Amino acid sequence: SPDFVHMNYSPMENGAEERLLPLAQDMGMAVLINRPFMNGRYFGMVAGKELPEWAADFDCQTWAQFSLKYVLANPAVTCVLTETTNPDHMEENIRAAFGRLPDESTKGRMRELVREFLDYITLRPSSGKTLETLPRR
């Protein structure tokens, strides 16, 4: 069997939680996560939105950490691959690995919040935004 598997996973793209991540964990495979920020579109989606107060309960200070802590809280995840050329963004990303992580109940709240943001974009075409046109960080 393979030594590792590489997949997309984030609060927005969380379909792997049901079968793929548990299967990889059961098989003892390393799991490398790609696109925790949807190629940067995540930042367009959360731009101008305030981080919820309850994010402090799991030591989350930024929207980047919000997504990364969600991913890192899954016990099947071995490594999260982020892409940036900005040293400040890299430091912010690294800080997500420290402190508390969200529990399953909190991860449910995180999914719901992000789903609301996605629904706003996809269900209100008058906003002029789509996932494809969202600005990237």
Language-model segments: residues:
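Structured C-terminal cap/extension of enzyme domains
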Residues: 1-4, 18-137
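Catalytic beta/alpha-barrel core
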Residues: 5-13
